[in-house]
């Protein structure tokens, strides 16, 4: 189950990275971050906004909301 969850997470982050979709990321402490994912790995997400980069650790992330519908899989219609 953990492997499938990691795969879905990777597919989502890679899709928004490739399509340069703006995200709003809410942290567990309530802080709201916005920007575009430029890179990610198993532990962190690199977010860019206004030419500045922020390295956000995944364990601190509560929710990620894309600014537009995301089509993650072939043949899937964006919602």
Swiss-Prot record:
Query: Where is the signal peptide, in residue numbers?
Result: none
Q: Which UniProt keywords apply?
A: RNA-binding, Stress response
* Keyword set includes RNA-binding: yes
> Which protein, by its recorded name, is this?
RNA-binding protein Hfq
Reported function: RNA chaperone that binds small regulatory RNA (sRNAs) and mRNAs to facilitate mRNA translational regulation in response to envelope stress, environmental stress and changes in metabolite concentrations. Also binds with high specificity to tRNAs.
Write down the CDD domains for this protein, in alphabetical order. Hfq
Q: How does it assemble?
A: Homohexamer.
